[in-house]
């Protein structure tokens, strides 16, 4: 399970991108002794930029992942996303994402750069979405992933809506408060 808090340091203006962090806490839900998960809480600490222009969003930055478990490593990562809003319900994006070695116990023992495609479908009830993504490595260790999920958010999106939604990164869901 993933929980996160978005903190904005500089708000987006006409010629200035938003600057902030989206600190994530990965809560263990699997049985570590059976190879299901890391077995401890681990963290993502990024610095992110975001700029909107009409139906387009550019989003990117870099961060550091802290994984306090034997056999895993702390490592840097970076990513850049281009997203397009198509109507009131659908968002599609393409992302370039790279990470360093994650440790010998992780599936990703070497560095990798991936390209992924994905998006959100927003249901009628605000704050409920269907997420989907597929990614494959283009450099480094071979990686392949597919993701589908249901996503619930709460909080304010700064526009008077009861839930805030932003797609900010790789491999699926994140919670956001603004």
Predicted regions mapped to residue ranges:
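Sequence-level detector for tyrosine residue identity
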Residues: 15, 32, 43, 64, ...
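Small-side-chain structural scaffolding
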Residues: 17-20, 37, 50, 60-63, ...
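Outer membrane beta-barrel transmembrane domains
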Residues: 81-178
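Hydrophobic, lipid-facing positions within transmembrane beta-strands of outer-membrane proteins
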Residues: 1-5, 19, 41-47, 76-80, ...
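Outer-membrane pore/translocation modules
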Residues: 1-73, 107-110, 156, 165-169, ...
């Amino acid at each position: 399970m993933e929980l996160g808090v978005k903190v904005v340091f500089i708000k987006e203006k006409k010629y200035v991108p938003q600057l902030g962090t989206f600190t994530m806490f990965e809560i263990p839900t699997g049985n570590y002794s059976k190879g299901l998960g890391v077995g401890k809480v681990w963290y993502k600490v990024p610095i992110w930029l975001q700029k909107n222009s009409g139906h387009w969003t550019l989003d990117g930055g870099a961060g550091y992942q802290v994984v306090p478990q034997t056999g895993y490593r702390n490592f840097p990562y970076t990513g850049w996303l281009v997203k397009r809003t198509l109507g009131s319900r659908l968002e599609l994006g393409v992302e370039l994402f790279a990470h360093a070695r994650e440790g010998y116990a992780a599936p990703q023992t070497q560095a990798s750069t991936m390209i992924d495609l994905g998006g959100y479908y927003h249901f009628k009830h605000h704050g409920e979405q269907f997420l989907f993504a597929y990614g494959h490595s283009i450099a480094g260790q071979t990686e392949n992933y597919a993701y589908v999920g249901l996503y619930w958010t709460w909080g304010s999106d700064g526009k008077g809506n009861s839930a805030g939604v932003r797609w900010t990164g790789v491999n699926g869901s994140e919670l956001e408060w603004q």
